[in-house]
Every structure is written in structure tokens, then in C-alpha cells.
A protein has these predicted regions:
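Outer-membrane beta-barrel translocator/receptor signature
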Residues: 1-52, 58-62, 113, 349
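Membrane-embedded beta-barrel scaffold of Gram-negative outer-membrane proteins
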Residues: 17, 118-134, 138-146, 307, ...
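Repeated loop/turn-to-beta-strand initiation elements of outer-membrane beta-barrel proteins
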Residues: 23-25, 61-64, 126-129, 187, ...
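Acidic/polar loop-and-plug regions of large Gram-negative outer-membrane beta-barrel proteins
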Residues: 34-38, 53-122, 137-170, 214-238, ...
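Structural signature of Gram-negative outer-membrane beta-barrels, strongest in the C-terminal barrel
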Residues: 55-59, 63, 170, 187-201, ...
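Face-selective signature of the C-terminal outer-membrane beta-barrel domain
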Residues: 115-138, 161-278
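Gram-negative outer-membrane beta-barrel transporters
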Residues: 259-260, 357-359, 379-461, 499, ...
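C-terminal beta-signal and adjacent terminal beta-strands/loops
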Residues: 359, 452-461, 482-529
Length: 529
């Protein structure tokens, strides 16, 4: 069980048990219930989760498992879009902490159901085979209020907010199978894997407007309480259906060329079919297929260090519209990576460094809003190149002292040398540590961490004003303490964003910004039986 700031409460139970004396039939049941607020005004969330699985060894080397999960999420007081980033003069707005522009009735309710089954068989020669099926069913209902317009001043908006209700869902069937094992050839041991996947998604969505829109006043920003009249959703604005079908066949081969040198190679064939209808009329129908190869080499320099290089093709379907409202095609590209991995202290401490380069073409980048179609459009970049490197150190440096240190640098540019994907930081640094005190205090573990990122920015759109939305570099600090009363009972305190830093966690959506969560604390009691 857990309790924390902002009226946060959570309870979870996890039960596992055999159903017979031999343990050949066993099950697990997990249930969780969460109620929480937020440092953002008005926002609250309820979430209930139930998960169960039964496994049965139906033969000496054959296991069958079936299960499912249900998740119900009820957030309320949410905002459709963030807070306007700039005023009418193009100057950044310094919103008060916790400022929100949702209505008390605005929400995004979701219900998810998952059902799955798998059969796994181990052959006498050491090979394994699996067949699986998963069914996913999702629905959502979201009456929302949108205020990411341009404020005339901090006192009010230039127009009344936009109100819209979204409703929809999707059903997905996923089939999969794989076989893997080892074989001997040329005096060495090798590994092979072969598999397939097939999925079909049928989705639908509707949006509703209200005839009450024109009667609503311009909101008072400074004294916003969320007490906005509940609309009468009486105008069907959009009704669409989508059908996506993806089929893939893949294989990988790991060859032991020498005692120290290994070759990993493989390929995946993907076929993607997508169809959209709007108002009963087919809006688009596309079919793409592609083979994406992969090849990599690893070389054991000694017992501590292993060097590697790898190359893979990229094929990424993009479900977005271009400026002329045609469907964007897939993005294609290549990824190259090289690095060194190390294992110290008998495997308790691991480190790695790597450099990478990703070249892509036909990448969709957000361009603006199309009022005629009531949706966003994207322009297609002729080419982008992302270069960077990353380093990581993780593990136990001394008895009872664990550390994690990770640093990533990446920069993306188009063919003209202009930076793109600027809403993502070029630099990320993560550091965390936990230390279990020695001697009489060995039941207590203390730790903390810091998350730092470099500057991010987004361009404004829609011709409202020119300029950039900028988030300067910032760092977030966290603390934790854990006390073990026994091997089965422990209590833990986590404090996130210790300094209560005010920052944008994302930006650019309809010229808006989303603030990150402020300081929060959570106490968790865990009891095992």
C-alpha cells in the first residue's frame, strides 16, 4: 500500500500459487487500485487494474498459458492541449505553478481488455518453439475543453475556448510464432531464430461539437476554477474508421566465427496495409512492403571488454497527412552503431560506450493546423541525419553501494544543415545511487538521483505570431530511503523533484506548453507472505 502528497493512494496485491501438489498447474493474480491528484490544479485520476494468468505443464516439455487483464482509467479535470506559451505580443507567459485550464467535467476515460494464450514446447535437441495469440480491446470517451489560443493578456483569451467530445475504440488481434535453438557446424556452436507475426487493427473514432459554443464567454484566466457549463454534444463533426494490417517474417543467425569473434545477421520482411474511411467514403488505402536487414559483429578483446559494430535498415510507416492532405508514406533509413561493453567485479558492475548515426528520408515533421480538415498536417523532410554517442555505468561499485550513470548526446539536422527534432534534448544526463548502511544500520538504505537535460525549443504555428517556445536546461533532484523491518516487510519513501522545479515537460502542441509535475512524495509499505 502507498500514500503520498496530492491525495495519492495506491493499493496492490500480487498472489502466486500452485494448484496441485506437483506445481504443474499454477496461477498468478495481480490487482491494483490507485487514486491520485496532481500538482496541476483540477487534475485527478482513478485507475483500477486486474491481471491474471494460469500456466499448465500439459506434457514433460510443453507448457500452455492463458490469461488476461482489465484496466479502467478515469482522469478528470484534464486539459485538451497545454497552456498557451506566448501572449499576443509573442512574449513567453510565466504561468503560476499548478495553473490548469481544464473544466471539472473534462476527462479522458479509457477501458482496456487484454486476453492472451501461448503454447511453448521444448524439443529433445534443445530447440524451443512458441505459438501465441493476443486480443486487445480499447475504448475511450473524452469530452474536452481547449484553450490553447493566444491570450490577449494574462487576464483573458482572444476568443472563447473550443469544446469537443471524442469517442472511439479499437480491436486488435495479434498472432505470433517463433522457433530458436543451437546447432553445430564447422566445429563451433551457433544459434538460429525464426519467427512470424501478424496483427489486424480495426479502429473507429467520432468527434462531436456543441451548438452552445457561440454562447460561451471569454474565460477569465486569473480566476479560473474549472466551473464551465457542461455542453450539449449535439453536432457530429467527424466519423472515421481505420483498418491496419501488418505481417512480418524474421530470422536471425548468430555464428561463432572464432572463440572471440561472433557474427549476428538477420532480416525482417514487413507488409503493411492501411485503409481509412470517413463518412462511409474511403479516404485512403495504402500497401507497403519492405525487407530490413541487420548485421552485427562482436569481438571479445579480453575477459573484460567486448567491442561491437552493427548496421540495420529502417522502415517506419507514418499515419499522418501532408499539406495537400494526402497520406504520408513510410520513412526509410539506415542506422550505424559501434561501441565497447565492459564487465567488472565478476559482473556486478557493467559499463558501455557507443557512437551512432541514423540517416533517414521522407520523415514527417509537424507543420501546422488545417482548419478545413480540423487536424494537423506534416511536411516531409528530404533527409535527416542524427549523430551522437552514449555512455553508461551501472551496478555495485562496493558492497551495498549501487550506482547508475548515463549520458546521451544526439543532434539531428536536415539536408540543409538546419536542426530538426528540437523538442527533444540534445543532451541527457542521469545519475542515481543507493547505499545500504553498514553495521547496526544495515536495515536502512538511502539514495538519490538527478536528471538533467539541455535546452529544447519548438516553433510556433498557425500564423498567430512568429517565434520559438524555449525550455532552458534544467535539473530535477530525487531522494529515497528504505527501511527493512524484516526480509518480508519494508517501507520506502520517495521524493521526486525535490527543489519543486518549474519546467516544461513537453511543448509545441497547438503553440502550448505542458508543465512537469512539481514536488511530490510517496510512502510505500510492502508486505510479503
Amino acid at each position: 500500500i502507498a500514500a503520498g502528497t496530492e491525495d495519492t493512494y495506491r493499493g496492490e496485491i500480487d498472489l502466486s500459487t500452485p494448484f496441485n501438489e506437483s506445481g504443474s498447474v499454477r496461477g498468478r493474480l495481480v490487482g491494483a487500485k490507485e487514486r491520485r491528484g496532481d500538482t496541476m490544479d483540477l487534475y485527478k485520476k482513478k485507475r483500477d487494474v486486474l491481471y491474471g494468468i494460469i500456466e499448465a505443464d500439459v506434457a514433460e516439455a510443453t507448457t500452455v498459458s492463458v490469461g488476461g487483464s482489465v484496466q479502467r482509467t478515469r482522469p478528470s479535470g484534464i486539459s485538451w492541449g497545454g497552456l498557451p506559451a506566448l501572449d499576443a505580443d509573442g512574449k513567453p507567459i510565466d504561468w503560476p505553478k499548478g495553473q490548469a485550464m481544464g473544466a471539472k467535467w473534462s476527462r479522458w476515460d479509457t477501458d482496456s481488455h487484454e486476453y492472451f494464450a501461448q503454447v511453448e514446447h521444448g524439443f529433445a535437441n534443445g530447440w524451443n518453439a512458441r505459438l501465441s495469440y493476443t486480443r486487445l480491446e480499447n475504448t475511450f470517451n473524452a469530452p474536452l475543453l481547449f484553450t490553447s489560443d493566444v491570450p490577449v493578456t494574462i487576464d483573458g483569451f482572444s476568443s472563447a475556448p473550443l469544446l469537443r467530445k471524442f469517442k472511439g475504440g479499437s480491436d486488435q488481434d495479434v498472432y505470433g510464432g517463433s522457433m530458436d535453438g543451437g546447432f553445430d557446424a564447422f566445429g563451433r556452436r551457433h544459434q538460429f531464430n525464426l519467427g512470424f507475426s501478424h496483427s489486424v487493427i480495426n479502429a473507429w473514432n467520432q468527434s462531436w461539437d456543441t451548438s452552445d459554443q457561440a454562447t460561451y464567454p471569454i474565460p477569465d484566466v486569473k480566476h479560473w476554477t474549472g466551473d464551465w457549463p457542461t455542453p450539449n454534444w449535439d453536432i457530429l463533426a467527424l466519423s472515421q474508421t481505420h483498418r491496419d494490417k501488418q505481417t512480418g517474417v524474421y530470422g536471425t543467425l548468430r555464428l561463432g566465427l572464432t572463440d572471440s569473434l561472433h557474427l549476428l545477421t538477420g532480416a525482417r520482411w514487413t507488409r503493411w496495409e492501411s485503409t481509412e474511411t470517413s463518412g462511409g467514403v474511403t479516404g485512403y488505402s495504402h500497401t507497403y512492403s519492405e525487407v530490413t536487414p541487420y548485421v552485427g559483429l562482436t569481438y571479445d578483446l579480453n575477459d573484460t571488454y567486448t567491442a561491437y559494430v552493427s548496421y540495420t535498415n529502417i522502415f517506419q510507416p507514418q499515419m499522418v497527412k501532408t499539406r495537400d492532405w494526402s497520406m504520408a508514406g513510410p520513412a526509410y533509413g539506415h542506422n550505424y552503431e559501434a561501441g565497447v561493453k565492459a564487465s567488472y567485479l565478476d559482473g556486478r558492475l557493467n559499463a558501455s560506450v557507443a557512437v551512432f548515426q541514423t540517416d533517414q528520408k521522407d520523415v514527417a515533421e509537424y507543420g501546422g493546423y488545417d482548419y478545413a480538415h480540423d487536424d494537423g498536417w506534416y511536411y516531409i523532410l528530404d533527409g535527416t541525419r542524427t549523430r551522437g554517442f552514449e555512455a553508461e555505468l551501472a551496478g555495485e561499485v562496493m558492497p551495498g553501494w549501487n550506482v547508475f550513470l548515463g549520458y546521451t548526446y544526439r543532434q539531428s539536422k536536415d539536408n540543409a544543415g538546419k536542426k530538426v527534432q528540437t523538442t527533444q534534448p540534445e543532451q541527457l544526463l542521469k545519475l542515481s545511487t543507493a547505499y545500504r548502511l553498514p553495521g547496526a544500520w544495515n536495515k536502512l538504505t538511502v539514495g538519490g538521483g538527478v536528471r538533467w537535460q539541455s535546452q529544447t525549443s519548438a516553433q510556433t504555428y498557425y500564423g498567430l505570431q512568429s517565434g520559438s517556445i524555449v525550455q532552458k536546461p534544467y535539473a530535477l533532484f530525487d531522494l529515497m530511503a528504505q527501511y527493512n523491518f524484516s526480509d518480508k516487510t519494508q517501507v520506502q519513501l520517495n521524493v521526486r523533484n525535490l527543489a519543486d522545479k518549474k519546467y516544461y515537460r513537453s511543448m509545441g502542441f497547438y503553440n502550448s506548453v505542458f508543465y512537469g509535475e512539481g514536488r511530490s512524495a510517496l510512502v510505500t509499505l510492502t508486505q510479503r507472505f
